[in-house]
Amino acid sequence: MKFFSVVTVFVFGLLALANAVPLSPDPGNVVINGDCKYCNVHGGK
């Protein structure tokens, strides 16, 4: 049962990461909640 909980947490972590990083064609052109003046957003890893 502990293995199942670890896998569940891992899957939800991947889903959260996928939602946090938009899969846009141009990773360098990411605008979050309107105009982003002081953002430090880096495309890629």
Curated annotation (Swiss-Prot):
Leader sequence segment: 1-20
Propeptide, chain numbering: 21-27
Disulfide bridge partners, by residue number: C36-C39
UniProt key word Signal: yes
Keyword Cell membrane attached: no
Family: Belongs to the bomanin family.
Physiological role: Secreted immune-induced peptide induced by Toll signaling. Has a role in resistance to bacterial and fungal infections.
Protein name, UniProt field: Bomanin Short 2
Gene: BomS2
